Design a protein with these regions (language model features):
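Membrane-proximal, proline-rich intrinsically disordered regions
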Residues: 53-54
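N-terminal secretory signal peptides that target proteins for export/translocation
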Residues: 1-7
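Boundary at the C-terminal end of the N-terminal hydrophobic targeting segment
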Residues: 25-28
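Short, contiguous alpha-helical
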Residues: 36-40, 44-47, 57-96, 135-182
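Bacterial N-terminal signal peptides
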Residues: 9-23
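Well-ordered alpha-helical scaffold segments within catalytic/enzyme domains
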Residues: 45, 49-50, 84, 116, ...
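Acidic/histidine-rich alpha-helical segments that form the ligand environment
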Residues: 101-139, 143-159
Length: 182
């Protein structure tokens, strides 16, 4: 009898967390919150790398057909705005001057695009993130997308451009912020 009670208590101690944990995990995990956390991290990383290139080198490009460093930043800003508009938010999108050459204007465009994205993501719920996004000409190769997929896609696109920016910095003798050591 003593062993049966001990066994019952042991089972209770071991099984109860398993019964409660999924419910707690569901409360803690959220599509919208996960995407917002990733978006915020990406903004911080991109603002640092964008500012890392000396102003007199913003026009640098490794080969003639490529975008220069400043254009890469503006390309990210424009893509952020264009893709986030697909999430049907009431937020007013910033206007990106794709011909900007001033460091201050370029960095402001990038920051504004991420701030716009932050507001758009915050306006979503897990349910709206699973709804279809507005269609664009890009759907011909990607197919219809959920709003969550659009956010994921634009972040993937940004990481691609980030990788190119790392090379631009290194070709100019600049260590990317993420690689710097104290």
């Amino acid at each position: 009898m003593k062993h049966a009670r001990l066994f019952s208590r042991l089972v209770l101690v071991l099984v109860m967390p398993l019964l409660v944990t999924p419910d707690l995990a569901a409360q803690a995990a959220s599509i919208q919150m996960n995407l917002l956390a990733d978006w915020t991290t990406q903004k911080d990383t991109l603002m640092k790398i964008a500012a890392a290139m000396p102003e007199d080198r913003l026009g640098y490009k490794p080969t003639p057909p490529q975008r220069n460093y400043g254009e890469q930043i503006l390309h990210i800003a424009e893509a952020n705005v264009n893709q986030m508009k697909r999430l049907a938010s009431k937020e007013t999108p910033p206007v990106i001057d794709m011909k900007a050459t001033s460091r201050a204007v370029i960095l402001k465009a990038l920051e504004d695009s991420f701030d716009y994205g932050t507001a758009v993501i915050k306006a979503q719920t897990d349910q709206t993130m699973l709804q279809a996004a507005a269609e664009t000409r890009f759907d011909s190769f990607r197919g219809q997308s959920t709003r969550a997929r659009v956010v994921s896609f634009v972040m993937g696109h940004t990481w691609d451009i980030y990788g190119q920016m790392v090379v631009y910095l290194r070709l100019n003798g600049v260590t990317p912020p993420a690689s710097q050591r104290p």
